[in-house]
C-alpha cells in the first residue's frame, strides 16, 4: 500500500533566510559584489550578494546575467544617479523587507525603486503615498467641518458626503465623523425658508439620538500620526490624483443614489442632490482642488498657461507638444512614451570640454572656471572653494596636523591610532600578509589585495570618460581630475594647486629644501624617489629606452620623447614673449631668462598644438642681446647634472656667431672668448669629458646667456 504525500511547509523559514542573509552582509561574509555609489562628491562602497540583488531588482539581474566573466570573482557595479543614503535604505529593504525612512524621503525611495526596477519597494512606496494622501484628505475635511460647526448658528449643518467616500472601507463613526446621510440637510438661499426634511430622515435622526450620540459630535483628527504636529504634505503625481478623483466621483454618485428612497417628493430629491453642489463650494474641497492643479502644473505644463509660464518651459516634446521645465523629465518622457533614446552631451560653456555626466561638469565649472571662495576659515579668514578644504586647512595649519598621533621613532604625525599602528610596521619590518602566488609580503591587507591584481590582471576601476582602467580606486579619482581639471590640493606657501596629495608633498620640498632620497654610490640626494631611480641608471649603465629610427638608447622615457622630436621636427613649446619655439621645456626655461632676469619664476610657456610651425622672421624683442646656442648649452648642461654651468665666468670680447638649426632659423650668437671658441671647435662640439674640466687656466669659459 502506497503511503500518501504530505506537505512540509515552514512559515518562519523565509523570514529566517532573510535575517541570516542580512547578518552575512553586515559581517561581510560570502559577499560577491561591491556596489560603488559616487554622487555629488560622496563616494561609498556597499558589499552585497549577487543572488539577493538579482532576485529583488531586475536592474541588477540584467547586469549580472550579462557579465562576460563568469569565474565567480567579486565584481564591482558603479551607480552615480543614486545617493548613498537612499541605496543603504534600499539594501536594508531587500534584506529585511522593511525600512524606516522620513516622510519626505518616500518619493526619493520610489524613484530609486523605479531606477533599480524593484517592484516590491515600488508597490510599498505607492501604497504608503496613497495612505498619506488619504490621511491628508481626512485632515482637510475635518478642518472644514470644524470651521462650519463654529460658524453655524442653527442646530443643523451641511456636511459633504465625500468624507466617507474618500476613505473606502473605513468606519466614519469610529473616527468621530458625522455621516451626512443620517442628518437633515438644509439650504438657505434667495430669502426662502428652509425645506422640511422627510419623515424617514427624521426617524433616522431620532434613532441616532437614542444611541446617546450628540447631534454635533466632537470632531477629532482621523489619524493619530498627524495629531499634535504640523503636517508638510507632499502631493503625489498626476496619475495618482486622477485615480483619487475617479474614486471620489464614484463615491459621490453612490451617495446621491442611496441617500433617500425613490418615493420621495421632488423637493426632497432636489434637497438630497444639492449637497454635491455644496461640496464643490466647500473650502476644503476648493483648497484640495487648487493644490492638485498646482501640482499638475509643476509636473506637466498644460496648454492653457500664459506667456511667462511658457518661457519657463525650456523643453518641449515635438511629438505630443508637452512642455517640461527640466531636461531630465523631458528625456525620461521621450524615452518611455515615444521610445526615443538620446545621448546627452554635457559640455562646458566656457571651454567647450565634454564630460560623461552632469556631476563631473559641475565639479569642473566649480573648481576650474569659478574663482569664488565661499567657505572662509574662522581662524585666519582665508577662503576656500569647498568645506572639506577648510577642514583640511584647519587640521594641517591651525591644529598641528597629526600631532595627536605621532610616531615615537621618526616623529611623523598620523591622523588616527590605526594609521599609527600601520606606520610603526615600517620601522619594525613586520609584514604579516603574504602573497600565495609569490614571495611578496605586506604590512597591510589592502596592499596585499592590490598586489594580487598584478597576478590576476584585474583592473576593476574604469574611467567613464576615456575607458582607462586602474587597479585602485584612488588612482581612478586622480585620473578623473585630468578630465575635470580639478586641483583640490593647494600649497599653503605659494598657492599653487595640484591634483593629488602626493604631488603637493613633492612640491612642498621645493620650499623646505628637503631631499630625503640619497644615492648610495655618489651620495647625491634627491627630492623625489623617482628622480633617484632615474639617477641610479647612470651608475648601472642601464638604458632601457631605444629610438626605433636611429637606435640611440636613453635612461629615461621623457629623454626618448625629446629625442624623437629631432626626427619629427616637432617643437611644441613656444615663448610667448618672442614667439620662438623649442623642442623641450628646459631649453625654453633657459631661454626665457633673457626676457626677465628679476623674475625667474615667471612662466613664458605656450604649448603649441599640431605640427611645428615655420618661425622664420621671428626675432627677439632686443636684437642687441646675444645669447648662447641652445645646442651648445644643452651639451654643456648634460655634463655633471648641470653642476658646473652656474660656475661659468663672463669674459670680454665677442666672436662671430655660431650657426645652428634653431626654431627661428636665425643665427644664434654666443658671447665667448677667442680661446673658448677655439677649444669648442677642436672638440667639434662633442660631449665634454671629465678631462675637459681641467683645461688650462688661461682658457675662459662660456658666459651667461647674454
Swiss-Prot record:
SUPFAM superfamilies: beta-beta-alpha zinc fingers (SSF57667), POZ domain (SSF54695). The gene is Gzf1. Transcriptional repressor that binds the GZF1 responsive element (GRE) (consensus: 5'-TGCGCN[TG][CA]TATA-3'). May be regulating VSX2/HOX10 expression. PROSITE patterns: BTB (PS50097), ZINC_FINGER_C2H2_1 (PS00028), ZINC_FINGER_C2H2_2 (PS50157). It is found in: Nucleus; Cytoplasm; Nucleus, Nucleolus. GO terms for biological process: branching involved in ureteric bud morphogenesis; negative regulation of DNA-templated transcription; negative regulation of transcription by RNA polymerase II. This is GDNF-inducible zinc finger protein 1. One of its GO terms (cellular component) is cytoplasm. Interacts with NCL. It comes from Mus musculus (Mouse). Expressed in several tissues, with highest levels in liver. Also expressed in embryos from 7 to 17 dpc. A zinc finger (C2H2-type) spans 315-337, 346-369, 375-398, 405-427, 433-455, 461-483, 489-511, 517-539, 545-567, 573-595. Belongs to the krueppel C2H2-type zinc-finger protein family. Residues 149-165 have a biased composition (Polar residues). InterPro entries: BTB/POZ_dom, SKP1/BTB/POZ_sf, Znf_C2H2_sf, Znf_C2H2_type. Residues 197-212, 242-277 have a biased composition (Basic and acidic residues). The modification Phosphoserine is found at residue 611. PANTHER family: ZINC FINGER AND SCAN DOMAIN-CONTAINING. Keywords: Cytoplasm, DNA-binding, Metal-binding, Nucleus, Phosphoprotein, Repeat, Repressor, Transcription, Transcription regulation, Zinc, Zinc-finger. Residues 149-220, 242-308 are annotated as: Disordered. GO terms for molecular function: DNA-binding transcription repressor activity, RNA polymerase II-specific; RNA polymerase II cis-regulatory region sequence-specific DNA binding; sequence-specific DNA binding; zinc ion binding. Residues 31-103 form the BTB domain.
Amino acid at each position: 500500500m502506497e503511503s500518501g504525500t504530505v506537505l512540509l511547509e515552514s512559515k518562519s523559514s523565509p523570514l529566517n533566510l532573510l535575517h541570516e542573509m542580512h547578518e552575512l552582509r553586515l559581517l561581510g561574509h560570502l559577499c560577491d559584489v561591491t556596489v560603488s555609489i559616487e554622487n555629488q562628491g560622496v563616494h561609498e562602497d556597499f558589499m552585497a550578494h549577487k543572488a539577493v540583488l538579482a532576485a529583488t531588482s531586475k536592474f541588477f539581474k540584467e547586469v549580472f546575467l550579462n557579465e562576460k566573466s563568469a569565474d565567480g570573482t567579486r565584481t564591482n557595479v558603479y551607480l552615480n544617479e543614486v545617493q548613498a543614503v537612499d541605496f543603504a535604505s534600499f539594501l536594508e529593504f531587500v534584506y529585511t523587507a522593511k525600512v524606516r525612512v522620513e516622510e519626505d524621503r518616500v518619493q526619493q525611495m520610489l524613484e530609486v525603486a523605479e531606477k533599480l526596477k524593484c517592484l516590491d519597494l515600488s508597490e510599498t512606496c505607492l501604497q504608503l503615498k496613497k495612505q498619506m494622501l488619504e490621511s491628508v484628505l481626512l485632515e482637510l475635511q475635518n478642518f472644514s467641518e470644524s470651521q462650519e460647526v463654529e460658524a453655524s448658528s442653527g442646530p443643523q449643518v451641511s456636511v459633504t458626503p465625500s468624507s466617507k467616500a474618500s476613505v473606502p472601507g473605513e468606519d466614519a463613526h469610529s473616527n468621530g465623523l458625522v455621516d451626512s446621510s443620517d442628518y437633515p440637510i438644509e439650504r438657505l438661499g434667495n430669502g426662502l425658508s428652509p425645506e422640511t426634511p422627510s419623515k424617514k430622515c427624521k426617524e433616522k435622526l431620532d434613532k441616532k439620538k437614542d444611541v446617546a450620540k450628540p447631534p454635533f459630535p466632537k470632531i477629532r483628527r482621523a489619524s493619530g500620526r498627524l495629531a499634535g504636529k504640523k503636517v508638510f504634505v507632499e502631493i503625489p503625481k498626476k496619475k495618482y490624483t486622477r485615480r483619487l478623483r475617479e474614486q471620489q466621483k464614484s463615491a459621490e454618485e453612490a451617495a446621491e443614489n442611496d441617500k433617500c428612497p425613490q418615493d420621495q417628493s421632488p423637493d426632497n430629491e432636489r434637497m438630497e442632490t444639492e449637497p454635491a453642489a455644496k461640496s464643490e463650494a466647500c473650502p476644503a474641497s476648493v483648497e484640495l482642488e487648487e493644490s492638485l492643479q498646482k501640482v499638475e502644473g509643476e509636473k506637466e505644463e498644460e496648454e492653457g498657461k500664459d506667456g511667462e509660464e511658457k518661457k519657463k518651459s525650456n523643453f518641449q516634446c515635438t511629438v505630443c507638444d508637452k512642455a517640461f521645465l527640466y531636461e531630465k523629465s523631458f528625456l525620461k518622457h521621450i524615452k518611455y512614451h515615444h521610445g526615443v533614446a538620446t545621448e546627452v552631451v554635457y559640455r562646458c560653456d566656457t571651454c567647450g570640454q565634454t564630460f560623461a555626466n552632469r556631476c563631473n561638469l559641475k565639479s569642473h565649472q566649480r573648481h576650474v572656471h569659478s574663482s569664488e571662495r565661499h567657505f572662509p576659515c574662522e581662524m585666519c579668514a582665508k577662503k576656500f572653494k569647498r568645506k572639506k578644504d577648510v577642514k583640511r586647512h584647519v587640521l594641517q595649519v591651525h591644529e598641528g596636523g597629526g600631532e595627536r598621533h605621532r610616531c615615537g621613532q621618526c616623529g611623523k604625525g598620523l591622523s588616527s591610532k590605526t594609521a599609527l599602528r600601520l606606520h610603526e610596521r615600517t620601522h619594525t619590518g613586520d609584514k604579516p600578509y603574504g602573497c600565495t602566488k609569490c614571495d611578496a609580503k605586506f604590512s597591510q591587507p589592502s596592499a596585499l589585495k592590490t598586489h594580487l591584481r598584478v597576478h590576476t590582471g584585474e583592473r576593476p576601476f574604469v574611467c567613464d570618460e576615456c575607458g582607462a582602467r586602474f587597479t585602485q580606486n584612488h588612482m581612478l579619482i586622480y585620473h578623473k581630475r585630468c578630465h575635470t581639471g580639478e586641483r583640490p590640493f593647494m600649497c599653503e606657501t605659494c598657492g599653487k594647486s595640484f591634483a593629488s596629495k602626493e604631488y603637493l608633498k613633492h612640491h612642498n620640498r621645493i620650499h623646505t629644501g628637503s631631499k630625503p632620497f640619497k644615492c648610495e654610490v655618489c651620495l647625491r640626494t634627491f627630492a623625489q624617489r623617482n628622480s633617484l631611480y632615474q639617477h641610479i641608471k647612470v651608475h648601472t649603465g642601464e638604458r632601457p629606452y631605444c629610438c626605433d629610427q636611429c637606435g640611440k638608447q636613453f635612461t629615461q622615457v621623457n629623454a626618448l620623447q625629446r629625442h624623437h622630436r629631432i626626427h619629427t621636427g616637432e617643437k611644441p613649446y613656444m615663448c610667448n614673449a618672442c614667439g620662438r619655439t623649442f623642442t623641450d621645456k628646459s631649453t625654453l626655461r633657459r631661454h626665457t631668462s633673457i626676457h626677465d632676469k628679476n623674475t625667474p619664476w615667471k612662466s613664458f610657456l605656450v604649448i603649441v598644438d599640431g605640427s611645428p610651425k615655420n618661425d622664420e622672421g621671428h626675432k627677439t624683442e632686443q636684437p642687441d642681446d646675444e645669447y648662447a646656442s641652445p645646442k651648445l648649452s644643452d651639451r654643456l648642461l648634460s655634463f655633471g647634472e648641470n653642476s658646473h654651468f652656474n660656475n661659468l665666468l663672463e669674459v670680454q670680447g665677442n666672436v662671430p656667431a655660431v650657426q645652428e638649426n634653431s626654431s627661428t632659423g636665425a643665427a644664434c650668437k654666443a658671447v665667448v672668448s677667442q680661446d673658448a671658441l677655439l677649444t669648442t671647435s677642436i672638440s667639434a662640439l662633442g660631449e665634454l669629458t671629465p678631462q675637459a674640466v681641467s683645461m688650462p687656466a688661461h682658457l675662459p669659459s662660456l658666459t651667461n646667456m647674454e
